[in-house]
Amino acid sequence: MSRIGKMPIAIPAGVTVEIAENNLVTVKGPKGTLSRVLPIEMEIKQEGAEVTVSRPNDLKRMKSLHGLTRTLIHNMVVGVTEGYKKTLEINGVGYRAQKNGKTLTLFLGYSHPIEMIDPEGVESALEGQNKIVISGIDKEKVGQYAAEIRSKRAPEPYKGKGIKYNYEHIRRKAGKTGKK
């Protein structure tokens, strides 16, 4: 059995999990509702306050889907109870961000500002002019939006200018040395 796949998923109080046909799993909690169609091959059962995932056989594909299915359900449960958050930092002279309604405007040294609209179910907030906090209940959407923002100006290795995750460490390079 998959080490991750065989672990049961604990359902906290205030969260309901519904498993419909074709493995459509709907999780409702205090922060909202998430639903997702999971691989049909997996068998998802709810027993009391926990959900278990089992696989029909030991083919390589089934083994990989086993852990994936369990993790996706777990991420949905955590999302509707606690939510997810990612923090981005902007470094560089003149690099900054502004928020206006659902529009995030980035000034990143290009000849034009970059405008990004928050996707549905994801919120962005600013802490000062150089910290962006992205939060939501869907881990995939939060991570995707954060990656899209970062891709607008990824950090460069010489001065570290650009947008990076708050936990990310930029490997610096020495610049070229001049003639003597």
Residue ranges and their predicted role:
Residues 2-66, 70-147, 151-180:
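N-terminal intrinsically disordered, cationic/polar leader segments
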